[in-house]
Curated annotation (Swiss-Prot):
GO terms for cellular component: extracellular region. Myoactive. It comes from the Eukaryota. This is Pyrokinin-1. The lineage of its organism: Eukaryota, Metazoa, Ecdysozoa, Arthropoda, Hexapoda. The modification Leucine amide is found at L7. The keyword Protein biosynthesis does not apply. It comes from Namaquaphasma ookiepense. Belongs to the pyrokinin family. One of its GO terms (biological process) is neuropeptide signaling pathway. The keyword Secreted applies. It is found in: Secreted.
Length: 7
């Protein structure tokens, strides 16, 4: 979605 932070 372009926002959901992923490490």
């Amino acid at each position: 979605d372009g926002y959901t932070p992923r490490l």
